[in-house]
Amino acid sequence: MADMDFNDRTVLVTGAARGLGKQIARAFHALGARVALNDLKGDAIAAAIADLGAGPRLAAAEADISTAAGCENAVRATLERYDRLDVLVNNAAVNWEMPIAAHTEEIWDKHVDTILKGSFFCAKAAIPALKDSRGNIVNIASELGLHPIVSNVAYCAAKGGVVNLTRALAIELAPDIRVNCIAPGAMDTELMRDCAAASGDAAAYYRYYQNFNPLKRIARPEEVAETVVFVASAAAAFVTGAIIPVDGGSIAGRL
């Protein structure tokens, strides 16, 4: 399908060394895109690039996107390598599940800075290049940004912020730049495995999330990545400001 062709297009994915971000990079690369992978550590990016097949259409954009300067560095690295930017995917995230009483200022700031602040300042840094290409932004929120759960306040708050950030960016950046948001449900990624291990009962953790939605299973990251690619493609040219759950019906079951 021509509308899903990303040949001669450049995509920057934050938090791309593992998990959903890596699958998003894989999906765009398979459709012909040049993909810049951002993450904190260069060796982790290099390993991801090797796993994706290496080659001239894959590049590192190492930076700490929890700071405005880091966001600028990630965008700059992409433009220095490929001289254009067509799609920004704000995917980077952290998640430490704990009750309110256990939250420190450092933990709160790490969630908000990585998830919400990073999404805003990456978008801000990318605006000139995206205007030139009439490109678009895809923010990765979460079903928990739409219906929170207990013992996850900082993550839920930051992801909820991404939802409204998407809408605010969409109305201000139109008509030149589209901005949309994917709100995934629980996915079988390294981040989820880390959370399961930290819970003290990984089997119970997985059972909880498997029963969280009507489909009674956890998503595969490639299922979410395919939705990201669609929203970023010409097939979704009339879609902006949308919040799209990819959650197995979890939110519908809570309306």
Predicted regions and their residues:
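Alpha-helical segment proximal to the catalytic Tyr-Lys
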Residues: 128, 171-175, 237
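Active-site helix of classical SDR
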Residues: 123, 158, 166
